[in-house]
Regions:
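Intrinsically disordered, low-complexity polar/charged tails and linkers
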Residues: 1-222
Length: 222
């Protein structure tokens, strides 16, 4: 009878930590009439194939102008849930310009009727701010201003930063989840449906040891 083989996993190599995406909020400093903006955008929008920066898509209520890279691969045109006080603008910008990493980047910009702005798909504050400056300058060239008053970029703020790194090895998610819960007593859930992965909450508090466990007496949001 053959003796059992003592399997040892190969060593992993962790890549450098990188910022994958950020969520930015800002404000025009004045309300904006989204219907007026929708009516004036068609002449200045660019098609998907056009190799330059520009506005690719504008989604307002149940209407849509243009298309984005994501639409082509998902066969989606209009968001299932449409809100009448907001619109979605998809712009194409050059990222890492002047370097060997230069390329096109599509950015989603949500515009709210009260003047609020939410931007996703950006990787740096500088790129986000420059993109919003470009959007403002572009809107200001329209024959009729959709803004109620003088617009500017106000309350620019980073709301969320997503980072990631790779181990370049297969991860046994079931075993990892059990290890985090049973061995380290961390808050963890194992997702096996649409967005597969191990969702772990590591609570950080400067007043307690870095074991990742919430020290609050009552349930909190971390």
């Amino acid at each position: 009878m053959a003796e059992p083989v003592d399997y040892k996993a190969p060593p992993y190599e962790r890549t450098a930590l990188r910022i994958s995406t950020m969520v930015i909020t800002c404000h025009w400093g004045t309300p904006i009439h989204l219907d007026v903006l929708f009516d004036q955008l068609p002449p200045i929008m660019i098609p998907m194939w056009y190799p330059d920066i520009g506005i690719l898509k504008f989604e307002h209520k149940n209407k849509v102008l243009g298309s984005s890279h994501k639409d082509i691969f998902t066969n989606r045109k209009i968001t299932p849930k449409s809100f009448f006080n907001q619109s979605t603008l998809v712009i194409r910008r050059m990222i890492h310009e002047g370097t060997d990493r230069a390329g096109w980047k599509e950015v989603n910009v949500k515009l709210f009727a009260n003047g609020g702005i939410q931007m996703t798909g950006v990787t740096s504050e500088e790129f986000a701010y420059q993109s919003l400056e470009w959007v403002l300058q572009t809107i200001q060239t329209l024959p009729v201003s959709p803004f109620e008053g003088k617009a500017s970029l106000e309350r620019f703020s980073v709301q969320l930063i997503n980072t990631d790194y790779a181990l370049n090895q297969f991860i046994n998610q079931d075993a990892l989840h059990k290890l985090l819960v049973n061995e380290y007593n961390l808050s963890s859930t194992l997702e096996k449906t649409i967005y597969q992965g191990v969702n772990t909450k590591f609570y950080y508090n400067t007043f307690h040891s870095g074991n990742g466990i919430c020290q609050c007496e009552n349930f909190c949001k971390g």
